[in-house]
C-alpha cells in the first residue's frame, strides 16, 4: 500500500492571512482578542488560537464595548460593520480579498439597480456576508440566493433583462458551472463577472483531487465538517468513482477503510494545516503504507498583505 499526496493542498493565501492576523493582533495588543465567527473553518486551528488568547463569538453583542474584534475570512455584512463602528470597536478585517471582490461586485450591481443572483449555500457565513452587501436603500433591484439547478427552474426575477450573478468562492466548480448554464438558458441577458468568483485555491485543489482520483482507490480529505471547500473535495472524489472520507485528523481513520487498498490519496482543504496531514501520513504508515509520493500540481505563490498595523512583529 502506498500514499499519494495531492498538490496543491492545505492552506491558501486567504487562510494564511486570516490566521496571521489573529496571531499578530494577540501578539501586538495582548489577549484577549475577540474574533467574530471561527476565523477559518478548522477545529485544530481554532483550538490553537483559543490557547493563544482568541475568544470566538458569533455576534458582536458578545464583544465588550471599546474592545478589538477580528472579522473572519468569510466576511461580514455591512450591518455588522456598521454595528462595530457604532460601538467603538477596533476592527481588523481578515476577510479574504477574493471574498471582498465578490462583495464589491454585489454592491456595484446594487447601485446600478440590477437584480443579483448569488449562487451559494444557505447559512454559510460567506453567503450571509455577501447577501449583506445589498443595500435596499441604494438601489431598486433585489438579491436572490440559488443553491442548485432545481431552484433555477422556479426562480422568479423581477428584472430578467437586467440582472447579474455572483458566486460563493468555495463551491464545486462543476456544480456551479451547471447552475450558471441553467440560469443563462432561462435568462439569456444575464451578466456575470469578468473572471470566475470561485477562487484560484478552490479550483486548484479540486483539479488536484480529480487527478488523484484517477490514480487511487481511496481518497482521504483532511478538513473539518463545517469547511465548505473540504466537503467539496470529498464529494468530488466520490463523484469521480472513488471511495472518499472527510476527516478532521488521523484519529478518525477507520482501519477498515484502508484494508485491501493499493493506492491511498491524501489531500487537505484550504483551511487544514500541514501538521494534520503529517499526522495522517504517520497513521497510514502504522496501518501498512510503505511509501509516499506527491503529484505535480499548479504552483501557488499568491500572498495577501496584512493590515499595516500588524505588519511589524514585536521583538522580545
Curated annotation (Swiss-Prot):
Pathway in which the depicted protein is active: Isoprenoid biosynthesis; dimethylallyl diphosphate biosynthesis; dimethylallyl diphosphate from (2E)-4-hydroxy-3-methylbutenyl diphosphate: step 1/1; Isoprenoid biosynthesis; isopentenyl diphosphate biosynthesis via DXP pathway; isopentenyl diphosphate from 1-deoxy-D-xylulose 5-phosphate: step 6/6
Superkingdom of source: Bacteria
Positions of [4Fe-4S] cluster binding: 12, 96, 199
Disulphide bond pairs: none
EC number in record: 1.17.7.4
Listed GO biological process terms: dimethylallyl diphosphate biosynthetic process; isopentenyl diphosphate biosynthetic process, methylerythritol 4-phosphate pathway; terpenoid biosynthetic process
Chemical reaction(s) catalysed: isopentenyl diphosphate + 2 oxidized [2Fe-2S]-[ferredoxin] + H2O = (2E)-4-hydroxy-3-methylbut-2-enyl diphosphate + 2 reduced [2Fe-2S]-[ferredoxin] + 2 H(+); dimethylallyl diphosphate + 2 oxidized [2Fe-2S]-[ferredoxin] + H2O = (2E)-4-hydroxy-3-methylbut-2-enyl diphosphate + 2 reduced [2Fe-2S]-[ferredoxin] + 2 H(+)
Keywords: 4Fe-4S, Iron, Iron-sulfur, Isoprene biosynthesis, Metal-binding, Oxidoreductase
Binding sites annotated in the UniProt record for dimethylallyl diphosphate: 41, 74, 124, 227-229, 271
Cofactor notes: Binds 1 [4Fe-4S] cluster per subunit.
Cofactor: [4Fe-4S] cluster
Function noted in UniProt: Catalyzes the conversion of 1-hydroxy-2-methyl-2-(E)-butenyl 4-diphosphate (HMBPP) into a mixture of isopentenyl diphosphate (IPP) and dimethylallyl diphosphate (DMAPP). Acts in the terminal step of the DOXP/MEP pathway for isoprenoid precursor biosynthesis.
Protein's UniProt name: 4-hydroxy-3-methylbut-2-enyl diphosphate reductase
Organism of origin: Stenotrophomonas maltophilia (strain K279a)
Amino acid at each position: 500500500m502506498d500514499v499519494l499526496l495531492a498538490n496543491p493542498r492545505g492552506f491558501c493565501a486567504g487562510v494564511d492571512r486570516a490566521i496571521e492576523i489573529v496571531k499578530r493582533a494577540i501578539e501586538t495588543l495582548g489577549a484577549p482578542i475577540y474574533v467574530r465567527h471561527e476565523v477559518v473553518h478548522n477545529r485544530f486551528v481554532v483550538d490553537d488560537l483559543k490557547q493563544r488568547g482568541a475568544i470566538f463569538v458569533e455576534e458582536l453583542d458578545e464583544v465588550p464595548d471599546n474592545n478589538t474584534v477580528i472579522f473572519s475570512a468569510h466576511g461580514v455584512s455591512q450591518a455588522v460593520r456598521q454595528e462595530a463602528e457604532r460601538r467603538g470597536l477596533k476592527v481588523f478585517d481578515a476577510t479574504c480579498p477574493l471574498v471582498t471582490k465578490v462583495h464589491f461586485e454585489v454592491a456595484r450591481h446594487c447601485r446600478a439597480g440590477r437584480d443579483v443572483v448569488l449562487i451559494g449555500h444557505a447559512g454559510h457565513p460567506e453567503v450571509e456576508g455577501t447577501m449583506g452587501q445589498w443595500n435596499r436603500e441604494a438601489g431598486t433591484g433585489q438579491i436572490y440566493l440559488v443553491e442548485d439547478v432545481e431552484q433555477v427552474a422556479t426562480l422568479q426575477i423581477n428584472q430578467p433583462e437586467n440582472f447579474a450573478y455572483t458566486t460563493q468562492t468555495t463551491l464545486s466548480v462543476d456544480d456551479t458551472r451547471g447552475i450558471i448554464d441553467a440560469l443563462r438558458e432561462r435568462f439569456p441577458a444575464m451578466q456575470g463577472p469578468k473572471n470566475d468568483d470561485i477562487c484560484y485555491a478552490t479550483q486548484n485543489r479540486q483539479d488536484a483531487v480529480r487527478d488523484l482520483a484517477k490514480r487511487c482507490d481511496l481518497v482521504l480529505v483532511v478538513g473539518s465538517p463545517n469547511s465548505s471547500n473540504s466537503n467539496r473535495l470529498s464529494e468530488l472524489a466520490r463523484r469521480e468513482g472513488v471511495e472518499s472520507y472527510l476527516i478532521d485528523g488521523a484519529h478518525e481513520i477507520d482501519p477498515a477503510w484502508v484494508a485491501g487498498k493499493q493506492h491511498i490519496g491524501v489531500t487537505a482543504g484550504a483551511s487544514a494545516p500541514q501538521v494534520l496531514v503529517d499526522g495522517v501520513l504517520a497513521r497510514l504508515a502504522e496501518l501498512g503504507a510503505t511509501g509516499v509520493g506527491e503529484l505535480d500540481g499548479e504552483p501557488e505563490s499568491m500572498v495577501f498583505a496584512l493590515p499595516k498595523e500588524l505588519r511589524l512583529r514585536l521583538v522580545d
